[in-house]
C-alpha cells in the first residue's frame, strides 16, 4: 500500500473545497462569486508553477517522482482527469450565480442581447476606451504570429477580404489593465472582449468577420536563478523577471468558436517563436474549451463594486487589543508579552510600533525581514523615513514568488533612503517574519521584538488568519539579533538559537523530538498540528509511528496533506481536518500535550524545513499558550466550515445540526474576549 497521497492531487482537493464555498447557498451572492474568482486565480498559479514544473520534468525525461511514487507523466494525466469534470462544475455554478444576480439587478449580459440603445453605448465605449488600447494583427507573410506573454487574453478571428475574397486570420490582443466588465447602464455589464468582437470590422477595414473566439494562455512562470553566478543579485532578479513572460505554454483556454478555428490557432501557436527563438513545445499542453467567460479571476471587479454591498457579507472591523490603547506601545510591551490573532484583532499595532520607532529619538536601530509587503506599504514608508535618522537594516527576500518585482522596488527605495538592505541569503529563502527594535533609555539598551506567522502586509492581514507576538524579553531579542547577524554574514545555518528554533537547522529535529516525547506517553500522548500543508515524508512517518504507539493526533491542514489518516495498523489514531472559510487559514500552531505549544512561520514541507530560514517559537507565557490552545480547540469543534479527510483521499464536511459552529464567525464575535 502506498503510504502517501499525491501532493498535486491533494492541492487540487483544496481548490475543490474553495469551489464548494461558491456553492454554499447560505452565502451572499457576491461572496459566492468571490470564491469562484479565488478558485480560478489559484488554478492559474498551479498551472504556472506546479504543472509547468511537471511538464519540464517530463519533456527533459528527468526521472523524478512524487511523494506517492507517481512519475511526471502520470501526475499530468491525473491532474487533467481530475479537472475535466470539475471545470464543468465551475461553469455550472457560475451560470447559477449569474442567473441569481440577474434577479438582484446585477446583469452580465451577452452583447447580442443588448437593445439598439445599449449597443450604441457599447460602440461609443469601444471608440473612446478600447480602440486605442487593443492590438490587432493580421497574420500573413509579413505579419507572423506575435509572442504571447503569460496570461495573455486575446481574440483569434477568421476574416475575409471583401475585394479579393481571400480568407486569412487575425489576432487581437486585449491589455490586462482594461476593465473587463463594462457597465453600460446601472447594473448592466458587458464583457470588454464581446464589445471588441462586435466591432472587429472597425479594426480590419474592408474585411468581413467570418468567425471569432476568445482565448487565454498560461505559461511557465517559474524563475530559474543560478545563484552561484550572481555578482549583483538584484540585477540578476530584475533580468530573470523579464524572462518570466517568455515561458512555455502549459494551458490554453478557449471560448466559443469553430473546431476549424481552434485547429488553426493551435497550428499558429506551434509555429510561432519566442523572443529567445526557441519554439514553444505544446506537447502535453492542457486545453480547455469553456462555455462561459474565460478567467473568472476578473470577477473581483464585480465583487468590489461599490453599488452592490448588499450582496456581500458585512465587513468586519478588527478590534484594537486594549493593551495597545495606550499612546506608548513600547510601555505596553514592556509590561507583558502579547499575542494578537489577526484579522480578528487588528494589525494596526504592528504598523504603529514601526511608525513610533521611526519617529522616536530614543530609537537606535530597526532590524526587519520583509517577504510580502504589497505595493502600497505604510511599513516600508516608515522604514524609509527612519533610515535618514537611525540604523535601519532590512532583509528583503527577492525570491518571494510573484512578489519579486514589488520587493525589488521597495529594496531599491530603502537603499536610496540610506537603509542597509540584504537581498536574501545564498541558496536559502528567508521566510521568517521578524522585527527587533533597539532603544536607549536611562542609559540602557532595550530591545522590542515582533514575530509572526504572517507577512508584514496590512491588506493580507485583513483576510489571512495569523498570530502575531510582541515581547520585550532580552533572551528572545538576543536570538533574533543573533539570527540577523547570521543572515547579514550569509551564515544562517551556522549558529543554533537558544530560546527559539530556526530552520533549516533546528525546527525539523525539534518537531521530531516533540513527537517522540509524546510517543513515550503512548495512549496518554496527544498532538495537534495546525498548518497550511503537510508534505514532509519524515515528519509523516514519525506521526505514523506515534499513532501506532497509541498517541491521539489531530491535524488541521488547510491545503496539501500527503499523510493518509485512519488506515488500520498505520494511522488509525490520526484525524485530518481542513477549514475553508471567508478568511484564509494561515497560522501555524503546533501543540504537544506533555511539552508545550508553539507557533511558527514554517509549514511541514521539505522546502520550509530544509531550504528556508524559518522560526519556531515556544509559547512560554501561560496566557499566550492558553490563547493558542483555545484557537485549536474551537477549530476542532467547527461544524460548518470544517472538512475531514478519509483514508481514500476524500474530504467530507463535518456537520452537527444540533450544534452549528463556524469557528471564524466565533472568533469575530469573541474578539478581545478570552477565547
Language-model features, listed with the residues they occupy:
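N-terminal localization/anchoring segments of enzymes in phospholipid and broader phosphate metabolism
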Residues: 1-527, 545-549, 561-675
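Glycine/threonine-rich ATP-lid/beta-loop region of ATP-binding domains
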Residues: 537-540, 544
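Hydrophobic alpha/beta core scaffold segments
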Residues: 552-556
Amino acid at each position: 500500500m502506498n503510504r502517501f497521497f499525491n501532493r498535486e492531487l491533494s492541492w487540487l482537493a483544496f481548490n475543490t473545497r474553495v469551489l464548494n464555498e461558491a456553492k454554499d447557498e447560505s452565502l451572499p451572492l457576491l461572496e459566492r462569486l468571490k470564491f469562484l474568482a479565488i478558485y480560478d486565480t489559484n488554478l492559474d498559479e498551479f498551472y504556472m508553477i506546479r504543472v509547468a514544473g511537471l511538464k519540464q520534468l517530463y519533456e527533459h525525461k528527468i526521472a523524478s517522482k512524487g511523494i506517492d511514487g507517481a512519475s511526471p507523466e502520470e501526475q499530468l494525466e491525473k491532474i487533467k482527469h481530475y479537472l475535466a469534470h470539475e471545470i464543468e462544475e465551475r461553469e455550472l455554478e457560475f451560470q447559477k450565480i449569474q442567473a441569481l444576480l440577474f434577479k438582484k439587478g446585477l446583469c452580465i449580459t451577452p452583447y447580442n442581447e443588448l437593445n439598439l440603445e445599449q449597443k450604441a453605448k457599447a460602440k461609443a465605449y469601444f471608440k473612446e476606451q478600447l480602440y486605442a488600447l487593443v492590438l490587432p494583427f493580421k497574420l500573413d507573410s509579413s505579419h507572423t504570429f506575435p509572442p504571447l506573454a503569460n496570461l495573455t487574453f486575446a481574440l483569434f478571428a477568421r476574416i475575409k477580404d471583401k475585394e479579393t475574397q481571400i480568407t486569412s486570420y487575425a489576432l487581437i490582443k486585449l491589455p490586462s489593465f482594461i476593465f473587463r466588465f463594462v457597465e453600460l447602464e446601472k447594473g448592466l455589464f458587458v464583457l470588454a472582449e464581446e464589445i471588441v468582437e462586435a466591432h472587429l470590422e472597425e479594426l480590419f477595414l474592408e474585411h468581413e468577420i467570418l468567425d471569432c473566439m476568445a482565448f487565454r494562455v498560461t505559461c511557465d512562470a517559474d524563475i530559474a536563478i543560478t545563484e552561484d553566478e550572481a555578482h549583483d543579485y538584484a540585477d540578476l532578479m530584475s533580468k530573470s523577471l523579464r524572462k518570466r513572460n517568455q515561458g512555455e505554454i502549459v494551458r490554453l483556454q478557449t471560448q466559443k468558436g469553430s473546431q476549424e478555428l481552434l485547429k488553426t490557432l493551435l497550428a499558429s501557436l506551434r509555429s510561432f517563436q519566442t523572443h529567445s527563438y526557441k519554439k514553444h513545445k505544446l506537447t502535453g499542453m492542457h486545453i480547455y474549451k469553456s462555455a462561459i467567460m474565460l478567467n473568472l479571476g476578473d470577477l473581483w471587479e464585480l465583487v468590489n463594486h461599490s453599488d452592490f454591498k448588499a450582496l456581500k457579507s458585512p465587513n468586519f472591523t478588527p478590534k484594537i487589543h486594549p493593551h495597545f490603547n495606550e499612546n506608548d506601545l513600547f510601555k505596553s510591551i514592556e509590561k507583558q508579552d502579547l499575542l494578537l490573532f489577526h484579522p480578528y484583532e487588528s494589525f494596526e499595532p504592528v504598523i504603529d510600533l514601526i511608525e513610533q520607532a521611526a519617529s522616536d529619538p530614543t530609537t537606535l536601530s530597526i532590524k526587519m525581514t520583509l517577504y510580502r509587503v504589497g505595493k502600497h506599504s505604510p511599513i516600508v514608508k516608515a522604514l524609509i523615513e527612519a533610515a535618514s535618522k537611525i540604523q535601519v537594516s532590512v532583509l528583503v527576500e527577492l525570491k518571494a514568488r510573484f512578489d519579486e518585482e514589488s520587493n525589488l522596488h521597495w529594496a531599491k527605495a530603502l537603499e536610496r533612503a540610506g537603509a542597509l538592505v540584504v537581498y536574501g541569503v545564498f541558496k536559502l529563502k528567508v521566510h521568517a517574519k521578524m522585527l527587533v527594535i533597539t532603544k536607549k533609555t536611562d542609559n540602557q539598551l532595550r530591545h522590542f521584538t515582533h514575530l509572526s506567522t504572517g507577512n508584514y502586509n496590512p491588506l493580507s492581514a485583513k483576510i489571512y488568519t495569523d498570530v502575531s507576538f510582541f515581547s520585550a524579553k532580552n533572551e528572545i531579542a538576543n536570538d533574533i539579533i543573533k539570527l540577523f547577524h547570521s543572515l547579514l554574514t550569509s551564515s544562517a545555518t551556522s549558529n543554533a538559537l537558544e530560546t527559539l528554533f530556526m530552520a533549516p537547522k533546528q525546527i525539523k529535529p525539534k518537531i521530531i523530538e516533540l513527537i517522540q516525547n509524546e510517543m513515550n506517553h503512548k495512549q496518554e500522548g496527544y498532538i495537534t498540528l495546525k498548518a497550511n500543508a503537510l508534505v514532509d515524508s519524515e515528519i509523516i512517518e514519525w506521526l505514523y509511528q506515534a499513532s501506532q504507539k497509541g498517541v491521539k493526533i489531530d491535524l488541521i491542514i488547510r491545503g496539501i496533506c500527503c499523510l493518509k489518516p485512519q488506515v488500520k495498523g498505520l494511522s488509525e489514531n490520526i484525524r485530518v481536518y481542513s477549514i475553508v472559510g471567508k478568511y484564509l487559514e494561515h497560522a501555524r500552531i503546533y501543540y504537544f500535550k506533555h511539552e508545550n505549544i508553539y507557533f511558527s512561520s514554517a509549514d511541514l514541507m521539505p522546502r520550509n524545513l530544509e531550504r528556508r530560514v524559518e522560526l519556531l517559537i515556544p509559547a512560554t507565557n501561560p496566557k499566550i499558550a492558553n490563547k493558542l490552545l483555545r484557537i485549536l480547540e474551537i477549530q476542532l469543534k467547527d461544524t460548518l466550515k470544517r472538512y475531514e479527510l478519509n483514508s481514500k483521499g476524500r474530504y467530507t464536511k463535518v456537520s452537527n445540526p444540533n450544534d452549528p459552529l463556524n469557528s471564524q464567525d466565533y472568533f469575530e464575535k469573541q474578539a478581545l474576549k478570552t477565547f
